[in-house]
């Protein structure tokens, strides 16, 4: 029995030696020549790059805690994720187009909270890239006998995201007979640092060029500024057909629209033209698709209809 055990051990050792000396018969898996490894799409590479840029931007933001100035991305597109905003910037996509595409910033009324950062009578805000849409609102004072006629005393403009672009008190050219302070919020004291009408008018004219103007009953604001704007580039919340039901078919007030559609109380006391412009822009943004349809119907290009018009039929030759 001991001899058998000894022989078995010798056999095992011999088998191990033989297996070690022989080359492996296993074939390595071949990579098929017809199916080379696919390259990652450039979009993925760009997106990865964007994420890295976003992370580095976030890291630098943490290091700069307490800084006074916010980034351009934060100013122009609140609610946009950093990586998405960076991607838009790299690909020359405007912040407002990005917000419109992803419905960012218009899901709630957070735009109205920006009032805490408003700079009264600041003039033109620097460092903001102004997009396609702007909203305007003006405050008037009374001139003439009894103060029944109106003259411009303040004008405010915000962008698509409710960010203040312009705000200025304006010196009326006529003598003010009624400051209407309880409504306008303007007093004689406000005029100490007011700008001349011509200066304000020139600034507003530049801002309006090539842009879509949003406002409430814009006819009065444009008349006060002695400016005009193409009808196709105007979006007026007072004339929008979808809002007329809130005033029994007539022009609804901005205060009623803000209350009914936004759940926001404005004009409770002294008016703020910045707040009113912001509320108007928010109303437009929340109902933009309906505004677009209404505008398309109103300014649809006229196309010649076939067949039945005079002069289209060939003349018959006389025999």
From Swiss-Prot:
Exonuclease domain sequence ranges: 132-293
Q: What does the record list as GO biological process?
A: ribosomal large subunit assembly; rRNA processing
What keywords sit in the KW lines? Exonuclease, Hydrolase, Nuclease, Nucleus, rRNA processing
Example of a GO MF term: 3'-5' exonuclease activity
Q: Which GO terms describe its cellular component?
A: nucleus
What Enzyme Commission number(s) apply to this enzyme? 3.1.-.-
Q: Quick one: where's region Disordered? A: 1-75, 295-319
Kindly list the places in or outside the cell where this protein is found, as annotated in its UniProt entry: Nucleus
**For this UniProt entry, which residues form the secretion signal?**
none
- Cite the Pfam families for this sequence: RNase_T
The task this protein performs is described as: Exoribonuclease involved in ribosome biosynthesis. Involved in the processing of ITS1, the internal transcribed spacer localized between the 18S and 5.8S rRNAs.
Q: Which family does it belong to?
A: Belongs to the REXO4 family.
What's the name of the protein? RNA exonuclease 4
Species whose genome carries this gene:
Gibberella zeae (strain ATCC MYA-4620 / CBS 123657 / FGSC 9075 / NRRL 31084 / PH-1)
